[in-house]
Amino acid sequence: MQAITSPFSESWGEYRLRKEDFSWHKANEGRLQGKWLRGLWSNELYQERRSSTTGRADDMMTVATLSLPPTLEIQKFVELFKLAYMHMRFVHPMLGVTIETNVFSIPLLPCFVYEQVTSFDEVQAWADRTVHVHTCESEQDRALSMSDRIQCVRNTVGTRPLPISQHTREWHIICFGREEDAHHVALMSYCAHSVSDARAELLLLQQLLDEMARLEGAWPVSASHPSHPAAHEWGSEIKRLTPSLMEMIGVPIDAFEEEAARELVRSVTSEPSLRLDEGRPIAEPELSETLHARVVFSKEETDALHQAAKAHGWSLTHLVDAARHMAYMQVRRPYLEAWHWSPIPEKLHTDFLIPMDARYAILETFRDGASGHVCNATEGFTTTIPLMDPYYIPIERELASSEKELHELSQVRTLAYMAQSLCLQYNAQKKQAKQRMMSSIPTLVLAGVFLPTYPFQSLSPEGFSSVGVVDRLLTTRIPLPGHTQPIDIIDWTVGLLMSKHRGSLQFSLHIWTFQEQLNLSVVHTPHITKERTALFLDTMRSTLKLFLMAYEQHGKPIDIPAAPPTPFKEPTLFQYVGRWLQSLLSH
């Protein structure tokens, strides 16, 4: 391995970085002269994985579906939303940043750009440019259900790249055409992942709706009204531009920990891991249509899963993540159980990435007070699970050959073993946030994220992501002054964009809780079939429900195996020959 040195050291040659490039500073020359700049680093750089060569495109697209009071016209809702959004730009100026490359010594190193506001007219033009209203233009549009209409707009918008040199966030207000949906709208946020995460989206949505209620209480709000965003001291918002997450949690920009970097590199390249599919699409990096599949547990089931997890010393996240690993194995079962003379190596998939909200670690100096940090504050870690640990015998196969209590079943015991293994890894990793931050700098450089050929592997990981969002962040009912009925948030979903390039995500799992109901959602490209996705989600759902039934029937916590309870048994020579003959006949 090449000797690891600090990316701020001169020995990096073309990779030499300047610390001052990563703090907000005013450009004194060049095409961005007079604008404020800051290089992206750490988690921001990881999320900003786009280029014309690699085709990475992991921008976020969240959707909140609202039920409006019958007395609130859609046109007025749009007007209130725009005013509230302009106010949020003053409170959180990061909403107004753009992203540029070819600015610093490394051409592909992206940087945030902010142009200080000199008049309210500029803010109004920005809002007009970034807030779009989608009305039903045809009979076909008007006949669509709310979910189908959202999916239609999502794929229309989501196959058009976000113009990040103009803005890094767009809002799309979706109207519906059926009579029963007349007083509903959907708020779709399309934004660069480097400037936001799922928790930030919820925080921002809550603040927007609260501000809309405040404006409605002061209505009519003219430009001279003190509640109007035109009354703000525009230009002073520059003081609230936020530094990188590393700085906010107290890690110096040029922090470096060589051994941690080496260990991180080893952990994501040496362990065998499953890949979802044997083949990958190889195409131009244009954005792909994405498909969405979802499982929603009832409030009672969600509460019971919480209680079952707690009884075993786990969180619900540990339990759900264990089911995720088992479902991932189930999708690959035919390959794992089949005999191959030359099996495809299973070492190219980076281990499961677990996002973590780092807002708890932000220093008091950088706290946004009650408003929360409405930017990307996600750091993460990987869990290392041996290739065959999630292997299990499905309940229908096991009960066909033996009689067992539910808590004795392979599927239940494997889930318990996996949850315990993940719990131990989670607890160990949570204490190492700053260490991971220090090691992520050289790791990102070693991974070649500054190279136009990144990712350089011929087979790149599909990648999994998860979002743990709790609904207490989002008030689902917002009273409106002057209206007898409130605005109700009746649904919320999170997704991301994908491209056809082999380096882009093809499949991503998201986990959240909304209105006390556990949601499991998969976003995938057509390359990953609907059947595979359905098998994945059905396995997660059935495994969790089976575990819950076993725990309730057993009446006490299930014994946690000390080792994988269902080791994979190699087929006998007779079985090998039989499968070989069967494969010949099938062709």
Predicted ranges, named:
Residues 297, 320, 408, 419-421, ...:
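Hydrophobic alpha/beta scaffold of the E2-like acyltransferase core of 2-oxoacid dehydrogenase complexes
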Residues 1-239, 317-333, 481-587:
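Non-catalytic N-terminal regions of enzymes
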Residues 85-100, 302-370, 551:
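Hydrophobic "lid/gating" helix adjacent to the active-site nucleophile
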Residues 2-12, 103-150, 154, 175, ...:
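Short beta-strand/turn segments that mark the catalytic/cofactor-handling region
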Residues 220-274:
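Secretion/export-associated helical scaffolds and adjacent low-complexity Pro/Gly/Ser/Thr-rich regions
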Residues 361-424:
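A short, structured beta-strand-centered segment in the mid-to-C-terminal lobe
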Residues 254-314:
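Flexible, P/S/T/G-rich "lid" or insertion loops adjacent to the active sites of thioester-utilizing
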Residues 179-180, 334-347, 391-411, 481:
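Intrinsically disordered, low-complexity domain-flanking/linker segments in eukaryotic proteins
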